[in-house]
Each structure stands twice: as structure tokens, then as C-alpha cells.
């Protein structure tokens, strides 16, 4: 990892470790973002019963819980903020669920199996990457042959739409 990328990741990690509680539960499934269509409208995931799912930038675990409630078979989450993962672990435990949680930047090599997941997804997280090409290649390697990557991120026009909602 380049020095500049490491600096950016550390700055972002510091922010999320400091302010994780302020963002608890924000921008999580079924919502894809502010004034976006929801999973209940789009049905991008369909039936996740028994499926293996990996969330990139899992934050406080609310989207993981969303899938647990829909009988996902196996849940994994990655986040570079230890505080976010502590919140996720506690939130999932309080609701009777669990997930394999990994504290790491999404750009890093991790102990995540290749050709394993039915879905990899990121709700408002992928835009934090310092290496989009490398991150997308990693995500592709985690997916089964017919696996699906779903993500949401904002566009500058969203600010105009959000103010009119």
C-alpha cells in the first residue's frame, strides 16, 4: 500500500472510530441511501435464504441484521473501524444474530475465501476505497462464479434531490 493511501485510510479510520456512534444504523438496508429506492422496492437480493453474504464496510451491522432476518445462511462483514465492529457485534448479539467480522481496510489482503460468496455488497461504503480497481478485483475474487456484487454510493445530484425530499 502506498504511503498516501495508508495516510488516507488512517485518517478515515480515526474519523469512524471517533464518530461511529453518531452514524449508528444510518444508511443501512433496506435503504440504499437518502431518497433512493429501497430493497423492498428493487428486490436486488431476492431470496437470501441459505446464501453466503459478505458486506464491505459493514459499519454498525444493521444491513447484516437485515439479511439475518431473511434467513441468510452465512454473514461476514469487513470494516476498518474497530469501534464500528464493536457496535456491530453488540447489535447483532442483542438481536440474536452473529457474523464473522474482520477489522481491515477493504483494499488489504484478508483471510476471506475466494469463490465463496453468493453476494458481496456495500451500502454507502465502497466510495471510501483508496484503490477502486484493486478493491473491485478483490470483491470479484470473493464471489462464486454466478455471484453478485451490489453497492450504493451517492452522486452529487443526490444532494439536490435530498433537499427536495
Task: Mark where each language-model region is.
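Conserved class I S-adenosyl-L-methionine
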Residues: 148-165
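A short, aliphatic-rich alpha-helical micro-motif
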Residues: 47-48, 114, 136
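A short glycine-rich, Lys/Arg-flanked "PGG" loop and its adjoining helix->strand segment in the class I
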Residues: 133-148
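A short SAM/SAH-binding and catalytic strip from SAM-dependent methyltransferases
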Residues: 118-132
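Class I SAM-dependent methyltransferase SAM/SAH-binding core
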Residues: 54-56, 60-108
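Conserved alpha-helix/loop element of class I SAM-dependent methyltransferases that forms part
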Residues: 28-51
